[in-house]
């Protein structure tokens, strides 16, 4: 399943040392947290629409709690850091607003991504969609006292420090364009570090909120034995990773691996033909049948209730997505796995998804069939295969 390469995207980060007392509003009492070091992010335009800020403040804790419960984390307190944007080298935003979610130790645990609705979005209740995942949180936490730039190319996300050395901090399985140079450099005279406005990502914008009540009351349902055992590298095997993860979960085993699945279905392919081969829905169904399952193809996104019932009955669901940005090239189609579902304390229904590119899960509005993924692309959930 293939797609084209996205253009380089840059997120310019400046880290500075600062001491700030932080109020912790837990159990109706204020508790001073430890002094925090701030991560400052360059932005071209700090203006964030009021409804975007309100949406993030209103809903972030419920979304975060659903992932905490999926990960079996203990109850905790969180707050939002200042929002930032991600920019291309032409200094234009990618259109999204990013809010870091801070724990009481001053580290970023999650990133809230709020995006304007795209044309093929099936939901219509709001101008924006909200998703939560770990995304770049680990990278932001590792460079608290340095000026850095974050870039992305066909191999993933890089941190470039003041000495101009680059370190790959987040891999994405994008195949390098044969026409592009192997080493891509920052355009001369257009360094995004020249952007002047900043937002302190690890500076809390409000009091810490405990998820104690939300944690106790919120409904979360998960495939009991779902684990991330492997992630997709530089290949076209997203369907193999998806099926392996689902079968390992529903059979409660560790024996399935993406490469072995792909080799079973394409035994005669070698070299790059094998490395970048994908699977059709028919091949996915056939493999499941050979493993004692009776999968069914559904030519649409599964509903929240369908996900809830199938997950309760230990039946996995594979997502078949078509890239909104381009129907051509590497990963124009993409497979992902449904991990479970949750009903937030505001009544919002979400589906928990695993993208084989990622080391964590993400939330998805159950009425929204367009899924934003970690490289900035969007996939329309057009079909499902269930019964793994």
UniProtKB/Swiss-Prot annotation:
It catalyses: Broad endopeptidase action on proteins including elastin, but rather limited hydrolysis of small-molecule substrates. Assays are conveniently made with hemoglobin, casein or Z-Phe-Arg-NHMec as substrate. In the cytoplasm, prematurely activated/folded ScpA forms a stable non-covalent complex with ScpB. It comes from the Bacteria. Cysteine protease that plays an important role in the inhibition of host innate immune response. Cleaves host elastins found in connective tissues, pulmonary surfactant protein A in the lungs, and the chemokine receptor CXCR2 on leukocytes. Proteolytic cleavage of surfactant protein A impairs bacterial phagocytosis by neutrophils while CXCR2 degradation blocks neutrophil activation and chemotaxis. Additionally, promotes vascular leakage by activating the plasma kallikerin/kinin system, resulting in hypotension. It is found in: Secreted. It comes from Staphylococcus aureus. The keyword Protein biosynthesis does not apply. One of its GO terms (molecular function) is cysteine-type peptidase activity. The active site is at 238, 334, 355. It is an enzyme of class 3 (hydrolase). Cleavage leads to the activation of ScpA probably by an auto-catalytic manner. Induction: Expression occurs in a growth phase-dependent manner with optimal expression at post-exponential phase. Up-regulated by Agr (accessory gene regulator) and repressed by SarA (staphylococcal accessory regulator) and sigmaB factor. Residues 26-214 form a propeptide. GO terms for cellular component: extracellular region. Residues 1-25 form the signal peptide. The keyword Signal applies. Its EC number is 3.4.22.48. The record marks 214-215 as: Cleavage. Keywords: Hydrolase, Protease, Secreted, Signal, Thiol protease, Virulence, Zymogen. Prematurely activated/folded staphopain A is inhibited by staphostatin A (ScpB), which is probably required to protect staphylococcal cytoplasmic proteins from degradation by ScpA. This is Staphopain A. PROSITE patterns: THIOL_PROTEASE_HIS. The catalytic maturation of ScpA appears to reside outside the cascade of activation started by the metalloprotease aureolysin (aur). Belongs to the peptidase C47 family. Optimum pH is 6.5 for elastin hydrolysis. GO terms for biological process: proteolysis. The gene is sspP.
């Amino acid at each position: 399943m293939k797609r084209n390469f996205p253009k380089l995207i840059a997120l310019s980060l400046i880290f500075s040392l600062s001491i700030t007392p932080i109020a912790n509003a837990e159990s109706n009492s204020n508790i001073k947290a430890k002094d925090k070091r701030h991560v400052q992010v360059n932005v071209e335009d700090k203006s964030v629409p009021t409804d975007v800020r309100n949406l993030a403040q209103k809903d972030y804790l419920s979304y975060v709690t659903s992932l905490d419960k999926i990960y079996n984390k203990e109850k905790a307190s969180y707050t939002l850091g200042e929002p930032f944007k991600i920019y291309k080298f032409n200094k234009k935003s990618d259109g999204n607003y990013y809010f870091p979610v801070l724990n009481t130790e001053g580290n970023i645990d999650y990133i809230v991504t709020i995006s304007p609705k795209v044309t093929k979005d099936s939901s219509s209740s709001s101008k924006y969609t909200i998703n939560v995942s770990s995304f770049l949180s680990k990278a932001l936490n590792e460079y608290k006292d340095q000026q850095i730039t974050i870039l992305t190319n066909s191999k993933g996300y890089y941190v470039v420090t003041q000495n101009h050395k680059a370190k790959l901090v987040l891999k994405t399985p994008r195949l390098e364009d044969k026409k592009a140079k192997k080493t891509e450099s920052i355009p001369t005279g257009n360094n995004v570090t020249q952007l002047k406005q900043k937002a302190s990502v690890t500076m809390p914008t409000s009091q810490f909120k405990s998820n104690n009540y939300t944690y106790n009351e919120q409904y979360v349902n998960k495939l009991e034995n779902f684990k991330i055992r492997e992630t997709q590298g530089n290949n076209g095997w997203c369907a193999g990773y998806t099926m392996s993860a689902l079968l390992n979960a529903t059979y409660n085993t560790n024996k399935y691996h993406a490469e072995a699945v792909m080799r079973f279905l394409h035994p005669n392919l070698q070299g790059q033909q094998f490395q970048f081969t994908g699977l059709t829905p028919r091949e996915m169904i056939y493999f499941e049948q050979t493993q004692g399952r009776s999968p069914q193809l559904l030519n649409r996104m599964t509903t929240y209730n369908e996900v809830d019932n199938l997950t309760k009955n230990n039946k996995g669901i594979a997502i078949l997505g078509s890239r909104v940005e381009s129907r051509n090239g590497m990963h124009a189609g993409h497979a992902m796995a449904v991990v479970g579902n949750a009903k937030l304390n505001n009544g919002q229904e979400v589906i928990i998804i695993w993208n084989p590119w990622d080391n964590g899960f993400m939330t998805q509005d159950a009425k929204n069939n367009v899924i934003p993924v970690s490289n900035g692309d969007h996939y329309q959930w057009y079909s499902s295969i269930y019964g793994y």
